[in-house]
């Protein structure tokens, strides 16, 4: 895997077309995600976004990474807040690239079924509108809804 990422890095460095650079970064992110190197995969997905801000697929990939990593706390309700962060990325994907709306909406529907119940959040002192920072490698803040 490291060798293939090295080839991607070389291609990204040599490429002058920003859209192609974005595509290389996105493909590298997919390879890393498939090999469970999530933090590094997210770095490449973010690079893909830097090179082409109008593509929604990198945001969808990041959302899928988050949804595959919901266990960062001993508190189940907090873990389920990870799905809010994933949904945030899917909303962003739709806003920058309407062509991915159908795929994003399907995932939003799926991930919404895994978000915490109001009563579970209540028991740990969290309510709708509060912000939660997702732990572990994700490290992003999201709003409870």
Where in the sequence are the language-model features?
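Residues in the short coil linking paired helices within alpha-helical repeat scaffolds
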Residues: 1-3, 37, 82
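Terminal, low-structured helical/coil segments at or just beyond the last alpha-helical repeat
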Residues: 92-145
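Residue-level recognition of tetratricopeptide repeat
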Residues: 1, 18-21, 54-58, 100-101
